[in-house]
Amino acid sequence: MKSKRRHSGRDVNGILLLDKPKNFSSNQVLQKVKSLFAARRAGHTGALDPLATGMLPICLGEATKFSPFLLNADKRYRVTAYLGHKTETSDAEGSVINKREITFTQPQLEEALEKFRGPILQIPSMYSALKHQGRPLYEYARQGVTLDREARRITVFDLQCLRWEGHELELEIHCSKGTYIRTIVDDLGEVLGCGAYVSDLRRLQVADYTHDSMVTLEKLEELTLKNNTLGSAIDLLLLPIESTALHLPEVNLESGAAACIKQGQPVSFFDNPTDTMVRLTEGGERHFIGIGIIDAHGRIAPKRLLRNVSDAL
C-alpha cells in the first residue's frame, strides 16, 4: 500500500502583492516566494510575460482557494509601444518582420485609440498560453504553425495616451480579464498604418489592489536575511484573505447559520441582494468565513470557504 505524499512547508495564509521583476517567468518568482515563506501551498493569479513587470498577486495557503476571483478581475497596465516596427511575437523578444514610416497625426492617434475603448472583439496572439488540443498556442507558433483562433469579447474600460515621442507611445489601459495587451498594441499599430510592438509592460493594478502595496523580491530576501525567526517579518507583508472579496456585498451570519454554511448547507436570508456573490462574515466581530452565492429565492449557498475562522487573519 502506497503512503500518501505529504507536502512540506508551513501553513501560512494570505496574499502577497509581488512586484515581479523583468526577465523572470511568473512561475519562477512564485517558487521563489514560496521558498522564502517556506509555505506549504502557493499559487499566482494570472501570469505576466517574462519581459513584463509589476503586480503579481501570490496566494499562500487557504488564499489559493480564492485565486480565481483575482484571475477574473479587472486589471490596469502601463505599456510602452515601439512604433514603426512589427514583430512576430508583438513584443521585443520577436524578430522584426515589417518596418514602416510613422505618418499619422495626433488627431488620427486619438481616433485610432477610440476604436479600442469599450466592449471589443479580440483575436488572441499565436504567441499566447491559450491551449489547443492540450498544447499552448506559442508551441505551435514556434513551429511555424498558425491556427484559427476565435475572437473573444473583452472590455477596455479606459485607454489613455500618456506620451508620444517619435517611435515611443506610452499608454495606460484598464481592461477586463482575458485582455492581451500585446494584441491591443499590435492591432493599434495596424490601424495607425505603421506597425507597433510592446517594448515595456508594467501591471499597476489587479482588482482593487493598487501599486503602492507591492513588495519586491529584494525586500523579501532582505527581511528574510535580517530575521532569524521563520516568517516573523515577511508574514506582516501579507494581506488578509478577505481582501479578495471586499468588493462584494457583505452578509453577516449569526453562529447557527454560519455553522450550516460551513457544513455546506444553504441557509435562507432575507433583505439581501439576489442572484449574486456575497462576502460571508460571522458574528459581531464579523470574521470572514468565505464567499457565498444568493439565489433568486434568497437562499445562500457556500462557494468558497476557509478551513477555519483563524485562517482569515
From Swiss-Prot:
GO terms classed as biological process: mRNA pseudouridine synthesis; tRNA pseudouridine synthesis
Enzyme Commission number(s) of this protein: 5.4.99.25
InterPro entries the UniProt entry points to: PsdUridine_synth_cat_dom_sf (IPR020103), PsdUridine_synth_N (IPR002501), PUA-like_sf (IPR015947), PUA_sf (IPR036974), tRNA_psdUridine_synth_TruB (IPR014780), tRNA_sdUridine_synth_fam1_C (IPR015240), TruB_C (IPR032819)
Claim: tRNA processing is one of the keywords in the record: yes
Keywords: Isomerase, tRNA processing
Gene3D superfamilies, per the entry: Pseudouridine synthase, PUA domain
Reaction equation(s) it catalyzes: uridine(55) in tRNA = pseudouridine(55) in tRNA
Catalytic-site annotation from UniProt: 49
Binding site for substrate: 44, 77, 180, 201
The protein's enzyme class: isomerase
Tagged with keyword RNA-binding: no
Gene Ontology MF: a single term: RNA binding
Protein origin, superkingdom: Bacteria
HAMAP family per the UniProt record, alphabetical: TruB_bact
Function noted in UniProt: Responsible for synthesis of pseudouridine from uracil-55 in the psi GC loop of transfer RNAs.
Family the UniProt entry places it in: Belongs to the pseudouridine synthase TruB family. Type 1 subfamily.
Protein name: tRNA pseudouridine synthase B
